């Protein structure tokens, strides 16, 4: 038995041909298949998966497999092919992994063997046969039946170079998943992380719910919404920027622990950390506060890492990070002074000094969001310039100013701040939570201030939501709520530098 000696060699000589010529040749092969009968059959049913066989029989030697004589049926995409006289090999990948097919005319018949020679990389093929181990130790299927299930008309990228164009990887994710192992691993890890979160929430007695994606009033976050029109109702609608106000309505209604994992939409810029459509998990729990939320969020993220990766100790962009260790907690001013110790307490309490300092960082203090900004908002802006990117280890930044936290409960002990936190890991915001404001009169007053800011030109300021105020007037129990960015969390867990790496089909400019 002769086996391939270069299992990773470039596919045939097709890479040297023009793609259009290759496609034309493959269309001609498809035309011939149509003339022979059903070109795309759908009557083959696999009995096994490649990864299961590789795992179960990893330690089985040739003799053991020969004695067992396990009959299998597998199907998948042909990734490698070697035609070598009277014996040929094909590496086939299914949804779980890959396995080698061993094909001879004596086993499958001369006609099938000759047909196989004309098949191309990327074709979906199927085989029945007996599991065995080759002389070189490769677990393989000795094919007794071999079929072509789906003809691939376009060639796969060169095995060695793959999809070198990063944008092409995002635009043609279906090809990226075929040829890039890391891409497949990333999205498997994403699914495991989300499943872990759902399990964690269920075990903590949270109920998963679904709230509207089309809102009559955008609310729950400071952001620019996408605007659309409902024809039948003849009314303007907004794609949701956050589910928060609807979830808290459910807390009013008596569902004391609720959560939702779904998409939010924000009509803003695109960056390695931002996509206009992104996935968030928000949860609300009656009779809790922001301190409870921090403990709970820390446990949730740690468990998601373990379930997705098998370990809470990870590596991100070449640096180690241990999510099993307790997360840090700092106030905004503590964080500034930790990473920019040149600032004194007196300077951080001086509005004029802060405005001058922010100008040095290129922050326009005359923009609407800063025109009437108090000390707290200015401190937050300085924090974003000096400390935020330095927060590599998991750190809760706590006690946010009330003027930038219109939905959070005010502190009982310190004027001007709220019981709010944001969680940063590797310099990125991962979560935002707070003790909920359940005083309807206070909430109404804060909404009015937001309206004033919007009238002054702040496009991200919130609208006044009269129905939400009405809901609060029925009485909402004290509660805590938190939002976790699923995409950013998955970036962290999969060592992905861009949010586009963890979204299957990220938004891109139109193709020319």
UniProtKB/Swiss-Prot annotation:
- Its Gene Ontology biological processes? lysyl-tRNA aminoacylation
User: Which PROSITE patterns is this protein grouped with?
Assistant: AA_TRNA_LIGASE_II (PS50862)
Q: What reaction does this catalyse?
A: tRNA(Lys) + L-lysine + ATP = L-lysyl-tRNA(Lys) + AMP + diphosphate
Specify the domain of life of the species encoding this protein: Bacteria
Its EC number(s): 6.1.1.6
Sites binding Mg(2+) 1 sit at 422, 429
Q: Record's Gene Ontology CC terms?
A: cytosol
A molecular-function term among this protein's GO annotations: magnesium ion binding
**Which of UniProt's keywords are assigned here?**
Aminoacyl-tRNA synthetase, ATP-binding, Cytoplasm, Ligase, Magnesium, Metal-binding, Nucleotide-binding, Protein biosynthesis
One Pfam match, given by its short name, reads: tRNA-synt_2
Quote the record's cofactor note. Answer: Binds 3 Mg(2+) ions per subunit.
Cofactor list: Mg(2+)
UniProt-annotated binding residues for Mg(2+) 2: 429
- Compartment(s) of residence: Cytoplasm
Cross-referenced NCBIfam families:
lysS_bact (TIGR00499), PRK00484.1 (NF001756)
The family classification in the record reads:
Belongs to the class-II aminoacyl-tRNA synthetase family.
Q: Describe the subunit structure.
A: Homodimer.
Q: What is this protein called?
A: Lysine--tRNA ligase
Q: Which gene encodes it?
A: lysS
């Amino acid at each position: 038995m002769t086996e391939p000696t270069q299992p990773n060699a470039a596919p045939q000589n097709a890479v040297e041909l023009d793609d259009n010529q290759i496609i034309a040749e493959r269309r001609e092969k498809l035309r011939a298949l149509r003339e022979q009968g059903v070109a795309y059959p759908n009557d083959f049913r696999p009995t096994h998966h490649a990864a299961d066989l590789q795992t179960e029989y990893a330690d089985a030697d040739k003799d053991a497999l020969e004695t067992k004589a396990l009959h299998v049926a597998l199907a998948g995409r042909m990734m490698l092919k070697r035609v070598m006289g009277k014996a040929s090999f094909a590496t086939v990948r299914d949804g779980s992994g890959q396995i080698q097919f061993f094909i001879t005319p004596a086993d499958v018949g001369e006609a099938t063997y000759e047909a196989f020679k004309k098949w191309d990389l990327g074709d979906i093929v199927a085989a029945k046969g007996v599991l065995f181990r080759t002389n070189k130790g490769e677990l393989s299927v000795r094919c007794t039946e071999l079929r072509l299930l789906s003809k691939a008309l376009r060639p796969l990228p060169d095995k060695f170079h793959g999809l070198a164009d990063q944008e092409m990887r995002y635009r043609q994710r279906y090809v990226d998943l075929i040829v890039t192992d890391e891409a497949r691993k990333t999205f498997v890890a994403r699914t495991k992380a989300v499943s872990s979160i759902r399990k964690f929430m269920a075990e903590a007695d949270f109920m998963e719910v679904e709230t509207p994606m089309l809102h009559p009033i955008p609310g729950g976050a400071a952001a620019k919404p996408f605007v659309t029109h409902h024809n039948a109702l003849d009314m303007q609608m907004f794609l949701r920027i956050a589910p928060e106000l609807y979830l808290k309505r459910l807390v009013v209604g008596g569902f004391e622990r609720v959560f939702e994992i779904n998409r939010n939409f924000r009509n803003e810029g695109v960056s390695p950390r931002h996509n206009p459509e992104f996935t968030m998990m928000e949860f609300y729990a009656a009779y809790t506060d922001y301190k409870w939320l921090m403990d709970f969020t820390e446990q949730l993220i740690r468990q998601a890492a373990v379930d997705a990766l098998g370990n809470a100790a990870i590596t991100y962009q070449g640096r180690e990070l241990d999510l099993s260790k307790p997360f840090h907690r700092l106030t905004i001013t503590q964080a500034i002074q930790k990473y920019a110790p040149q600032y004194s307490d007196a300077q951080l309490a001086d509005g004029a000094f802060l405005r001058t300092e922010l100008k040095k960082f290129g922050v326009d203090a005359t923009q609407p969001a800063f025109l009437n900004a108090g000390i707290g908002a200015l401190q937050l802006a300085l924090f974003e310039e000096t400390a935020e990117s330095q927060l590599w280890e998991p750190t809760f930044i706590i006690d946010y100013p009330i003027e930038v936290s219109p939905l959070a409960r005010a502190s009982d002990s310190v004027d001007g701040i709220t019981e709010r936190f944001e969680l940063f890991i590797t310099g990125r915001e991962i979560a935002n939570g707070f003790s909920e404001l359940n005083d309807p009169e206070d909430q109404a007053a804060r909404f009015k201030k937001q309206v004033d800011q919007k009238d002054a030109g702040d496009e991200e300021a919130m609208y006044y939501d009269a129905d939400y105020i009405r809901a609060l007037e029925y009485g909402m129990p004290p509660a805590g709520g938190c939002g976790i960015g699923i995409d950013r969390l998955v970036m962290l867990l999969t060592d992905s530098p861009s949010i586009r790496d963890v979204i299957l089909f990220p938004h891109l400019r139109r193709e020319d």
